[in-house]
Amino acid sequence: MDLSETALAEAVGAARQAFARAGDLDALARLKTEHLGDRAPLALARQALGGVPKDQRADAGKRVNAARAQAQQAYDERLAELRAERDAAVLVAERIDVTLPSTRQPVGARHPITILAEHIADTFIAMGWELAEGPEVEAEQFNFDALNFPADHPARSEQDTFYIAPEGSRQLLRTHTSPVQVRTLLARELPVYVISIGRTFRTDELDATHTPVFHQVEGLAVDRGLSMAHLRGTLDAFARAEFGPQARTRIRPHFFPFTEPSAEVDVWFVGKKGGAGWVEWGGCGMVHPNVLRAAGIDPDVYSGFAFGMGLERTLQFRNGIPDMRDMVEGDMRFSLPFGVGA
């Protein structure tokens, strides 16, 4: 192997010319192997140093190392140039013309159940009521026992209620928001005027008029001297807020374990799609004395009323929605008409 300065200079010159001709990074990588790899002339020159006489080996080594450094520098410079060209091309390709009209992003919509729940809350807060909350995983004591449900009441069966494992834990997914009544009476000073809005769970099949997970609004008032007249006035105000100023209510005798007397509420209103008439809306009544006693309240001193309505049902008949499944499928096309980005 010729280790003269002339031979090494020729090898360096060949490498420089080759690197300069490289049109892209892939081509440069191939040329690097050819001129700086283990079988390249400069690599073979380094291997040949072993055959050089000892008194000449140091000078020869310096020449070989200098030549290789020059070739490496030529490679590094061309590599930097090609990378700069690539980055510039990417910037041009991805350049954004800020003068062009922007691409409009789709606007989301809040779910109509959320909108209805917040409107109901605002209505009662304006009347001086407060909001109350309770857990969705509830104790059987609050869901049934404290609400005067007898031990053999059919609502306690697994055909109607989701119980939490293990068996015998007496924990369940609340079947109504009425447990908030008891928790509120135990936790707050009287008088009490609260509403609770939240999810409830029953073993219903999802169809056009039923869903296993639905929302309820529960109203509770306990004070001295409350009567059915106060309940009727509250229901009428609630109905007008949700169904329009012409709406009115009527009540029909019914039975609920936690109220006495109990009634079902019908509402008359003009529908959003035309037509007017009476529709069953929910349940109501005077708080049962046993419920007051369970909360440590003397029913001879205090009385109260309660009412409860389903939000999905309210939305369905108020807005003429034929299929309740539309409310749970998450299709934004269903939610948009109720309030874009509301």
From Swiss-Prot:
EC number: 6.1.1.20
Subcellular location: Cytoplasm
GO molecular function: ATP binding; magnesium ion binding; phenylalanine-tRNA ligase activity; tRNA binding
Cofactor detail note: Binds 2 magnesium ions per tetramer.
Residues where Mg(2+) binds: 260
GO cellular-component term (any): cytoplasm
One Pfam match: Phe_tRNA-synt_N
SUPFAM superfamilies: Class II aaRS and biotin synthetases, tRNA-binding arm
Reactions catalysed: tRNA(Phe) + L-phenylalanine + ATP = L-phenylalanyl-tRNA(Phe) + AMP + diphosphate + H(+)
Gene3D superfamilies documented for this protein: Bira Bifunctional Protein, Domain 2 (3.30.930.10)
EC class: ligase
Keywords: Aminoacyl-tRNA synthetase, ATP-binding, Cytoplasm, Ligase, Magnesium, Metal-binding, Nucleotide-binding, Protein biosynthesis
CDD domains per UniProt: PheRS_alpha_core
Location, primary (coarse class): cytoplasm
An example Gene Ontology biological process: phenylalanyl-tRNA aminoacylation
Cofactor or coenzyme needed: Mg(2+)
Domain of life: Bacteria
Family from the record: Belongs to the class-II aminoacyl-tRNA synthetase family. Phe-tRNA synthetase alpha subunit type 1 subfamily.
Oligomer and partners: Tetramer of two alpha and two beta subunits.
Full protein name: Phenylalanine--tRNA ligase alpha subunit
Gene name linked to the record: pheS
